[in-house]
Structure formats: structure tokens, C-alpha cells
Amino acid sequence: MQSRIDKLCEKMHDNEAVFISSYPNIFYYSGFTSEDAYLLISHSGKYIITDSRYTIQAREQAKGFEVIDIAKGFEKIFSRIDEKYIGFEESYMSVAENKRIRAKLKDGQDFVEMQNLINKPREIKDECEIKKIAEAEKIGDMAFEYILGRIKEGVTEREIAFDLEFFMKKQGATALSFDTISASGIRSAMPHGIATDKKIENGDFLTLDFGCVFEGYCSDMTRTVVVGKANDKQKEIYNTVLKAQTTAIDAIKAGMKCSEVDGVARKIITDAGYGENFGHSLGHSVGIEIHENPSFSPKNNAVVQNGNVITVEPGIYIDGFGGVRIEDLIVVQNGKAVNLTSSPKELIEI
């Protein structure tokens, strides 16, 4: 954790400190696993502010941080540091909380927005983070192999989702990355079709988008299968998405613009006549949170870097017919994409 703090402090001016209120950044910089805390990081000291329920836990997890009981020491916490500008995370703090924290500043100090500075180091995953994400993705791969044996005509979307989630937790997942997407038939045209009591029917597409959390880090993958035999149009759509996905993964190189990676997949889908049916970005970074930066989007000119962990998930969605999405999770290492997802991608007919 100290190396992460050192990198953060290198980006801060001598008269700047940061006050962190979001769980993802509290966990990233301290290792503390409760949401009931704040961090104050300056050039001269590190403080974790929490209540009496968590002070022992904070001492055990947040090594190198001075633990401050929120009931006793919070009122004068900013008097412990000399920095003038205290950075906060705009997206994670309500107006009311911001006002309450500002009232605790000492004379001459100012509360300023520094969310990008605080978040930026998380874009490049270290070896320990990559291992945890890879383990979470491995659990997802095992879950997909398991669920293939449970999918059949007459089973509901919700039953499939529940089975997936229960299996992942049995394998060591501590939570889900997000609500499992289980969408069949014409509902598969909804990119975020949350599971319902709809029964799976013969001839349906079934799209499953799921992930789990392992030691604080998320996984994410999507597979689309056909229940029964695929018709010609289903095969055409599926193979178009598969070509777009595999070609984009092969094209990823450190130094490329994220928009260029998106463009590789988008061109294939557009050339096949389905450009208007691919409405979302190609992918997003994954880490402590399921959606992080950078993303593979048409408008993102950020550069791909070694250590980025990003999804590649093109899709085609046709209202009234159904949809296909195929998603892998990749890490950029030695200048190219390394796939963390091992589940098969050829069209599966069940």
C-alpha cells in the first residue's frame, strides 16, 4: 500500500493533501475493508478516521495509518497537517457531507476537487491486483462450465442467474460484481436484461453476463448460447460479433488510442450491416469497481497502457428478435492483450 501512497504523493504539490471518502479508494490506498471510514493523506502523515466498531480492524488492516476515533478526533483532524489545499472526490460526496467536512478545516485551508488525481493510479494494475482479478475471472469460467449443464427448455432466467451466483460463492467469491444479466429470446436484445421469471424456450438466444468479487477485485464475462438449434440469422449475428471481438483483442497494443480499439470492432459490425445495433462502447476497465477507467469507447482518446485490465464486449441487439454479446476480460502486458477469460467462444447449441 505504501508504494501506492508514494505514487499519489508524487502527483500532489507540496501544499496539497487528499481526503478520501469512497470505499474503492479507501480500500486501494489502505487495505481497509469497511465503508465507514475516511482517509486523510498528506506529505507528512496518513490518518484513517472511523468509529469505535472498526478501530481494531483499522489497526490490523491499514498498516502505517494513524487510527483516529471519529467521535474523539475528527473535529480537529485537519489541524494535524500543514497543507493548504485538501482534495476530495466530487462524485462520492454529497453536498451536505461536503459542507460538513469544510466546516472542520482550519483557517487558511481550502477544500478542492481532486478526484481524477486520486483515481488515476488505479488505471494501472500491479501484479497483485492482476492475480486477484484473474482468480475472480477463473471462478466465472468455472461457473459458465457448470451452468451449461443446467440450461434447458422450461428453466427460468431467474433460476439460471441464481444457480450461477450460488456456484460462484461456493467457489470462494465474496460478492457479485453486479446484478447477473440473464436474458433469453427477444429479451436478449436488452444489453442489461436483468433476470425475470420468463421460461427459456427452444430456439432462444440466452445471454449471460456475470461476475464475482475475489479479495476485493471484480471479474466480468458474457456468453450467449442458443437453446436448441440456431437458425441462419442467429449464426450470422453470432459469427459477426465473434469476429469483431477476436479481431479487436488481437489488435490491442500499448500506445493505441482506446477509440482505435473500439473502431476495430465497430467497423466489422458496421460493414456487416449492424452498425446501428451496436450502441454501447466496446469495453470498460475492471478492478475494485466493475466500471473503471479507461474505456474502449469511440470518443476516448486515452492511450492503452501496460497494466490496463479492460473488457472487450461487442454486441448486436435487434428489437423483437434478440441479441448477442461476447465478453472477455484482458490485461495489457508486454504491449499486447493477454486474455484472462478461458471459456469457449464458438457458438454453443444446447
Stretches found by the model and what they are:
Residues 1-350:
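Active-site neighborhoods and metal-handling regions in enzymes and metal-associated proteins
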